[in-house]
Amino acid sequence: MIYMNDLKLPWNAQFDAPDKYGLAPGKTFNFKLGTSDNHTLGAWFILSDAIYHTIPFPPSPSAAEQTLSEALTSHPTIIFFHGNAATRALPVRIQQYSAFTSKLCANVLAIDYRGFADSQGSPSEDGLSTDARAAWDWLISNGAKPDDILIMGHSLGTAVASALAVTLSQEAVRFKGLVLMSPFSSMYTLVDTYSVFGLFPVMLPLTMVPHAADLYKSFLQHKFDTLSVITKVKVPVLIVHAENDWDISHTHSDAIFDALLEPYLPSVDALPNEPLSRTKEQWSTYQTQVAKKREVRESLLSRTYMPNFGVMVKFVASGETIVLLKTLTGSHNEVGTLEGTQEVIRNVFSFA
């Protein structure tokens, strides 16, 4: 249920023929990416339109590979970590690559994790983190500058992207930023709220048996706990979620945004667990602290309402910009295809 990597849509894809799936002829370099634990991953490097348009048309099939170095040194690159199921050739993912290469004038590196598509191995939380680092290292080894690389994840890919962003931040590597589209705060929370097609809560049958849900979660091997590590990321962060996402509730994005904001808010002393043991003074102090925290929170936040599109909430702290974009439409899979989302990405991360 977590990975669904056997659902290799589109079926029998020809990854060495990316133009068959809507990308322009000669714009994409299909290659194999090696990992530190000796797995081989399928990957596409897609040229920025700004570079692609300098190549005489029609380009040779190897045009993207031949132009790789120039593309990486002259234009920013987005590493795109997709969600569960399917492959890098899924139409909705192709739409996003095309938009990013045109609207943002960015190159795109899209990989398939181990066990997905034409990649070797079986997926695991540690394995996907290793795959993400391999993608980063490949870009750097081919001439990309860290501050030209935007790390982006969708759904499951947000946990992968966050883990890479945390690792790089701990290594004091300064990169362009982090985008989380339709994220979940942790796998523990997701299993409580996830609904298939927005209609069938996966945990509903277990809630009918006392403690069954807690027992099930205790056996989760893949935690993907973005919420517990996101504050370690030291670059600008954009969180994007559609209010009509019926797969993963937009409350997950609220939780991640609140976690990033929390260190800049005054603390509130906890009240005694037993209501009868609370003194009048404790309750008064608690109310005062809560009011102060709310006041400081509102002073830090700015809101921009965009009619018929959504709302953008932003704060700047420690020199970093943190943005939460809530769109009215886009559902779970298509929020990244919205032109409004792409414009927000362009503005937050100063794409040309």
What residue ranges belong to the model's regions?
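N-terminal membrane-anchoring alpha-helices
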Residues: M1-L23, V268, P272, S284
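Membrane-embedded segments
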Residues: G34-W136
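Alpha/beta-hydrolase fold nucleophile elbow
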Residues: G143-S155
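Short beta-strand immediately N-terminal to the catalytic nucleophile in serine-hydrolase-like folds
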Residues: I151-G153, V179-M181, V240
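Glycine-rich nucleophile elbow surrounding the catalytic serine of serine-hydrolase chemistry
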Residues: G153-A163
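Hydrolase active-site cap/lid region
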Residues: A163-V229, W246
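Short beta-strand/loop motif that positions the catalytic acidic residue
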Residues: K232-V233, I239-H241, D245
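C-terminal catalytic histidine-bearing segment of alpha/beta-hydrolase fold enzymes
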Residues: D247-H250, D254, Y264-A352
